[in-house]
From Swiss-Prot:
EC number per UniProt: 2.3.1.108
Record gene name: Atat
Start and end residues of each stretch annotated as Disordered: 196-295, 314-362, 418-443
Record field: compositional bias (Pro residues): 339-356
Name assigned to this protein: Alpha-tubulin N-acetyltransferase 1
GO molecular function: tubulin N-acetyltransferase activity
The keyword Cytoplasm belongs to this UniProt entry's keyword annotation: no
A GO CC term assigned to this protein in UniProt: microtubule
Source organism of the structure: Drosophila melanogaster (Fruit fly)
The keyword Acyltransferase belongs to this UniProt entry's keyword annotation: yes
Binding annotation for acetyl-CoA: 123-136, 159-168
Bias type Polar residues, positions: 233-254, 426-439
Key words of the record: Acyltransferase, Transferase
Biological role: Specifically acetylates 'Lys-40' in alpha-tubulin on the lumenal side of microtubules. Promotes microtubule destabilization and accelerates microtubule dynamics; this activity may be independent of acetylation activity. Acetylates alpha-tubulin with a slow enzymatic rate, due to a catalytic site that is not optimized for acetyl transfer. Enters the microtubule through each end and diffuses quickly throughout the lumen of microtubules.
Catalytic reaction annotation: L-lysyl-[alpha-tubulin] + acetyl-CoA = N(6)-acetyl-L-lysyl-[alpha-tubulin] + CoA + H(+)
């Protein structure tokens, strides 16, 4: 027995008291000052009994403390005391119980979510008073107060002494293995033995075994049936039509994101719209609800015919392309005779109008039987880089072109098609064959039909 330095008789009006999160006995009556005093004394009693229980079970730290009890709202501690022992009385035992939400395995090995499961969290009787019936007295008082049954209780990490106690006094021997530290006995999931309202251990259950939780699966697929009749209900549900399941789902209105509106099946609308003729024009399944049987090949063939008809209605014959008539090739113009006009006096540069000379005449002079181009040649085609500056065109060499300039006749003047053996005359003579006047037009040709090559003396060339 555990004795304290203060008198425990005012706290224990009866041998077994019940303490909740307020740390006051259920039989306590007093003012504010007495409440504070009683709270401090109950804190010391609970902490010392919890430490003795942890030492007896070989735990590193106590499971039961006054601070944990104050922070919880679903735990209760039952204390057993002897007011006649010693001078101030003595506390003999402790029993802590509560409710927990657990995932448990049933006899068939299926996982079940059980809410508000009755749990035995800590049980201790002083070694000097064991095997005297005090533990059975304390445990039975708890069952009567909580309206539980021993078979419906789960035990958290029971010791060998506690297992022997339950086997001796309540006949609990066959254990259902669990993945957690809790121990269940056979009959825990059997609702037939529930004695009273809270004895079944399922606060959210009903007498017919219907188990409803806040899980999304409950909103989507309906409630879960527990107990022995679960297999019978499962077999009967498989034999019923799917409409019963749909009716069960619609009865429980989903909430949250599970209650959002889902889009209808577009393929079903296409099939029903293809089957229904254009009488109603809504494309729904009302036209086909009478027979209920849809011939899929006929529907597919009908859709294919409809698509082909739409394509034929929208199709059109392309107009034949008209091939362009080939343009007649221009006949080659005869080369005009080159008439050399009388040259003006030397060193006279009189510009000739552009209408006097044409590019066709200039190009016919250079080369053998050259024809005028059908389009205007650019300097990318001809390589005549300085054509746009009007200083002359590039020299196009041919077999009839000679460069015989022994002496300086005039600046930038080269005679073309000079007959062989022709001697160069002096600048003082009247050489009409050698002198030419540069025309501003005509593509850089002189009046005699020569190419003005003075751009070769330019530094930028």
């Amino acid at each position: 027995m555990v004795e304290f330095r203060f008198d425990i008789k005012p706290l224990f009006a009866q041998p077994i008291i019940k303490v909740t999160s307020n740390l006051l006995p259920n039989t306590f009556r007093g003012d504010r000052r007495q409440c504070l005093d009683a709270t401090s004394k109950m804190t010391e009693i609970i902490d010392q009994l919890g430490q003795l229980s942890a030492t007896s079970q070989g735990l590193s730290k106590p499971v039961t403390t006054a601070q944990r009890l104050r922070m919880s709202d679903n735990q209760t501690i039952y204390l057993l005391a002897d007011n006649e022992a010693g001078h101030n009385g003595a506390v003999l035992g402790l029993l802590k119980v509560g409710t927990k939400n657990l995932y448990l395995f049933d006899e068939a090995g299926k996982t079940r979510m059980v809410e508000q499961t009755p749990s035995i969290l800590d049980f201790y009787v002083h070694e000097s008073r064991q095997r005297a019936g005090l533990g059975k007295r304390l445990f039975q008082t708890m069952l009567n107060e909580e309206q539980w049954t021993a078979r419906k209780c789960s035990v958290d990490r029971p010791s060998e002494k506690l297992l022997s106690f339950l086997s001796k006094h309540y006949g609990l021997k066959r254990i259902i293995p669990q993945a957690n530290n809790f121990v269940l006995y056979e009959g825990f999931f059997n609702d037939g033995e529930s004695g009273n309202g809270g004895g079944n251990g399922h606060a959210n259950g009903t007498p017919n075994g219907l188990h409803i939780t806040n899980s999304p699966n409950t909103h989507l697929f309906g409630a879960t049936y527990l107990g022995e009749d679960s297999n019978q209900r499962r077999g009967s549900q498989q034999q019923t039509t799917p409409n019963a399941r749909l009716q069960q789902i619609t009865q429980i209105s989903p909430s949250g994101r599970y209650g959002a509106k889902r889009p209808t099946c577009s393929m079903a609308e296409i099939i029903h719209a293809g089957n229904s003729k254009g009488g109603n024009g809504n494309g729904s399944a009302e036209a086909n609800s009478g027979n209920g049987n849809h011939d899929i090949p006929e529907i597919a063939e009908q859709l294919q015919r409809q698509s082909l008809a739409d394509l034929e209605a929208n199709s059109y014959e392309p107009e034949p392309e008209v091939e362009p008539e080939p343009e007649p090739e221009p006949e080659p113009e005869p080369e005009p005779e080159v008439i050399t006009p009388p040259s003006p006096p030397p060193k006279s540069h009189t510009p000739t109008p552009p209408s006097v000379r044409s590019p066709e005449v200039a190009e016919s002079i250079v080369g053998d039987n050259r024809r005028a181009p059908a389009f205007q040649l650019s300097k990318q085609h001809t390589g005549m880089k300085n054509r746009s500056f009007g200083v002359g065109m590039a020299v196009m060499p041919s077999s009839k072109m000679e460069f015989d300039q022994m002496e300086r006749e005039d600046f930038g003047v080269v005679k073309i098609n000079r007959p062989p053996g022709h001697e160069v005359t002096s600048p003082g003579q009247d050489n009409t064959d050698a002198m030419s006047t540069v025309s501003s037009g005509g593509g850089g040709l002189t009046d005699q039909g020569y190419y003005d090559l003075k751009f070769y003396h330019n530094k930028l060339w």
